[in-house]
Curated annotation (Swiss-Prot):
Keywords: Activator, Cytoplasm, Developmental protein, Diabetes mellitus, Differentiation, Disease variant, DNA-binding, Neurogenesis, Nucleus, Phosphoprotein, Transcription, Transcription regulation. Acts as a transcriptional activator: mediates transcriptional activation by binding to E box-containing promoter consensus core sequences 5'-CANNTG-3'. Associates with the p300/CBP transcription coactivator complex to stimulate transcription of the secretin gene as well as the gene encoding the cyclin-dependent kinase inhibitor CDKN1A. The modification Phosphoserine is found at S162, S259, S266, S274, S335. This is Neurogenic differentiation factor 1. It is linked to Maturity-onset diabetes of the young 6: A form of diabetes that is characterized by an autosomal dominant mode of inheritance, onset in childhood or early adulthood (usually before 25 years of age), a primary defect in insulin secretion and frequent insulin-independence at the beginning of the disease. GO terms for biological process: amacrine cell differentiation; anterior/posterior pattern specification; axon development; cell surface receptor signaling pathway via JAK-STAT; cerebellum development; dentate gyrus development; embryonic organ morphogenesis; endocrine pancreas development. The gene is NEUROD1.
């Protein structure tokens, strides 16, 4: 049995290969283009990944810094006492400028307020009954004196009567310091030792106290200062002029004045004076009769004309046979005997002076 040519060729003999065709070349060029595109895409993706990694690292660094700052602040807050309210913001330039502007406005408001307060206190110092060219009252002393002055004037208006000068000055000086009290006493021409109760206790018994029945100022005068609103204000040129007391009882009244008294003529005794009242800007003292003065120092005896002839008549006054010839009030004798010998002599001298 024999094989055909075709079969033998297909089975054993290899067929020769020809040159590559144009289709194969097209396919190979397309594959190269695809590979180049893939490489470019890979490079772009790699660059993008690198950029993202860099940016991510920076963000992570910032986040880490913020976390560290927050941790430090928390540690500081743990060490310090916790503050209530909103957290303090960081100061920027704009905030600093706004803060400075607010402080400047607040300082200006406070400065204007203090200037107005000082001006009002200066006006008040011109009204209160205290004036000195060398000394200036403090703010608290000015307010205290003004309060006492208003209280004293309101008491005068309420009662409708003029109180005693000593009580008026005591009301003015209530709660004031010693320098202010001395200034008030100097303006009213008084000795502060005469109306201070704590000092009256230490005074010797032979010196007259503030409650003495004879007046401190047995005369009338007008002082252009010490007005009360709305009658006027006190000017710095006003000076307080006071006349000295009469010659006959200057020694008895000397403790009430700072300076020694001089001799001068004076009108007759008119009784104690009331506290100063402001009328058209001038202070005047009003004479008032004093029942207490007549009560304390009235020791009267009604003698017949014949009993004053000789010494025998004086000896017979206190005898039993001479009782019908004189009249001696019993209450006056008791009140007179209660005084000491020195006060008895002083009262007798004053009685002789005032009733002659």
């Amino acid at each position: 049995m024999t094989k055909s040519y075709s079969e033998s060729g297909l089975m054993g003999e290899p067929q020769p290969q020809g040159p590559p065709s144009w289709t194969d070349e097209c396919l190979s060029s397309q594959d190269e283009e695809h590979e180049a595109d893939k490489k470019e895409d890979d490079l772009e993706t790699m660059n993008a990944e690198e950029d993202s990694l860099r940016n991510g690292g920076e963000e992570e660094d910032e986040d880490e810094d913020l976390e560290e700052e927050e941790e430090e602040e928390e540690e500081d807050d743990d060490q310090k006492p916790k503050r209530r309210g909103p957290k303090k913001k960081k100061m920027t330039k704009a905030r600093l400028e706004r803060f400075k502007l607010r402080r400047m406005k607040a300082n200006a408001r406070e400065r204007n307020r203090m200037h107005g307060l000082n001006a009002a206190l200066d006006n008040l110092r011109k009204v209160v009954p205290c004036y000195s060219k060398t000394q200036k009252l403090s703010k608290i002393e000015t307010l205290r004196l003004a309060k006492n002055y208003i209280w004293a004037l309101s008491e005068i208006l309420r009662s409708g009567k003029s109180p005693d000068l000593v009580s008026f000055v005591q009301t003015l000086c209530k709660g004031l310091s010693q320098p202010t009290t001395n200034l008030v006493a100097g303006c009213l021409q008084l000795n502060p030792r005469t109306f201070l109760p704590e000092q009256n206790q230490d005074m010797p018994p032979h010196l007259p106290t503030a409650s003495a029945s004879f007046p401190v100022h047995p005369y009338s005068y007008q002082s252009p200062g010490l007005p009360s609103p709305p009658y006027g204000t006190m000017d710095s040129s006003h000076v307080f002029h006071v006349k000295p007391p009469p010659h006959a009882y200057s020694a008895a009244l000397e403790p009430f004045f700072e300076s020694p008294l001089t001799d001068c003529t004076s009108p007759s005794f008119d009784g104690p004076l009331s506290p100063p009242l402001s009328i058209n800007g001038n202070f005047s003292f009003k004479h008032e009769p004093s029942a207490e003065f007549e009560k304390n120092y009235a020791f009267t005896m009604h003698y017949p004309a014949a009993t004053l002839a000789g010494a025998q008549s004086h000896g017979s006054i206190f005898s039993g046979t001479a009782a019908p010839r004189c009249e001696i009030p019993i209450d006056n004798i008791m009140s007179f005997d209660s005084h000491s010998h020195h006060e008895r002599v002083m009262s007798a001298q004053l009685n002789a002076i005032f009733h002659d």
